[in-house]
Design a protein with these regions (language model features):
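Conserved HGGG/HGGXW glycine-rich cap/lid loop of the alpha/beta-hydrolase fold
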Residues: 10-65
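Conserved acidic catalytic loop of the alpha/beta-hydrolase fold
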Residues: 74-91
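Alpha/beta-hydrolase fold catalytic core
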Residues: 1-25, 47-50, 88-89, 116, ...
Length: 268
């Protein structure tokens, strides 16, 4: 990993693979996940001629872990610091889970000047269910808005049980280094609440670059309908649902995910 310093002095980390002159593809992992979780995507993207960057923003992976001050706005600013420090142009931003909504935070603050396309991996832009958005986190609505994630991410009873996922589980455990530390610090709980209560639909509607929304058909967290509904919010949106796939769509079914991502990147 290579380090760089954010504008407030916090250390961020990233790795580079592939052709330094290739089109930049920036991979952003989700909540509690590290840059290493993209291990199944890096070789495929690098082999296709891209400059591949996997990033650990503050509080994740090998980056510095401040006890406080990490929210979605700060994550968007961290991403800006990375893109600016490396002077990336026409970058494809790919975000899994919270990494996806981090992209909307970045775009809402800094615009599209450095970005040519966006791919969101199994992340609804609005986790709170409402009359106009039934594609949020299962059983999460105004009635439990401030309590549902008070102790972490609750089980939903949806998706394929881990014991029945076979090789999908093996890939998941490999990419996530055995599952990682599931305990949450007060700072992480604050970030999770900020993530859960945000609504990024206006940011999507303001986007003019191509956006691909990918859903796992068997996601543990939300119905796969979020992908098509999100794509409908932006003029250059498209969506895909991967069969027999969970929330970690790029990890559980990497061949199908990589095939679709590479085909889409080649078109946009």
């Amino acid at each position: 990993m290579t380090s760089l310093t954010a504008d407030d002095g916090v250390r961020l980390d990233y790795t580079e693979h592939g052709d330094p002159a290739g089109r930049p593809v920036v991979l952003l992992a989700g909540f509690k996940a590290s840059a290493a979780s993209w291990l199944y995507q890096v070789p495929a993207l690098a082999s296709a001629g891209h400059r591949v960057l996997t990033v650990d923003l503050r509080g994740h992976g090998l980056a510095e872990r401040p006890a406080t001050g990490v929210d979605m706005a700060r994550r968007g600013q961290d991403l800006a610091n990375v893109l600016d420090a490396l002077d990336l142009r026409a970058a494809v931003l790919v975000g899994g889970s919270m990494g996806g909504n981090t992209i909307w935070s970045y775009l809402s603050q800094h615009g599209e000047d450095r970005v040519s396309a966006v791919a969101i991996v199994d992340q609804t832009p609005k986790m709170l269910n409402s009359a106009d958005w039934p594609h949020g986190f299962y059983s999460y609505d105004d009635a439990n808005r401030d309590t549902h994630f008070a102790e972490g991410i609750p089980a939903t009873g949806h998706g394929t049980p881990l014991a029945r996922r076979g090789m999908r589980l093996v890939r998941l455990l490999t990419a996530m280094k055995g599952g990682g530390d599931r305990t949450l610090t007060p700072g992480e709980l604050t970030l999770l609440h900020d993530h859960a209560t945000a609504d990024w639909r206006p940011a999507i509607a303001a986007t003019t670059v191509p956006v691909l929304f990918v859903a796992g058909a068997e996601s543990e967290f939300w119905p796969s309908t979020h992908a098509a509904a999100s794509a409908a919010l932006t003029p250059r949106g498209s969506s895909a649902v991967i069969r027999k796939d969970g929330h970690a769509a790029n990890i559980e079914q990497p061949k199908a995910f990589n095939r679709g991502l590479l085909e889409w990147v080649g078109r946009v």
